Amino acid sequence: MGIGKFACRKLVHDRKLYRWSDRDYARRVLRLDEKADPLEGAPQAKGIVLEKVGVEAKQPNSAIRKCIRIQLIKNGRQITAFCPGDGAINFIDEHDEVTIEGIGGRMGGSYGDIPGVRFRVFKVNDVSLEEMVAGKRDKPLR
């Protein structure tokens, strides 16, 4: 490989070519993570609650984490979302409209001992779930 005065064109060409060997570069440029993401790259999304589900915690913990299955309004995809807070699941009923966000796991993945759950609920019918759990606000009737 040339390193002379006029070798710049070849060096740039080779760099562009070998860039594609880098897996992270290829995924970023082809936007593969965005295409696979149910939220389509957005930070938040709204959905309709289909059912309440209990997800068993991974070893060594023993618990049933309260989650919900929701169908996203924007694209119809179904996902599972975690309901954080003591008794938070009691404020969520079927057919409610919830707003979700990422749960905060590494590289957009799941968090802690909840397997396969990448999202969490933070609003129910446009009211903060945290405020409802704390008793500051009541759940509105839709």
Swiss-Prot record:
Gene Ontology MF annotations: rRNA binding; structural constituent of ribosome
CDD domains in UniProt: Ribosomal_S23
Classification via Pfam families: Ribosom_S12_S23 (PF00164)
GO BP terms in the entry: translation
Keyword hit for RNA-binding: yes
Keywords: Ribonucleoprotein, Ribosomal protein, RNA-binding, rRNA-binding
Entry GO terms, CC: small ribosomal subunit
Family assignment from sequence similarity: Belongs to the universal ribosomal protein uS12 family.
Subunit structure: Part of the 30S ribosomal subunit.
NCBIfam families: PRK04211.1, uS12_E_A
Function per UniProt: With S4 and S5 plays an important role in translational accuracy. Located at the interface of the 30S and 50S subunits.
Name of protein: Small ribosomal subunit protein uS12
Record organism: Methanocella arvoryzae (strain DSM 22066 / NBRC 105507 / MRE50)
Gene name linked to the record: rps12
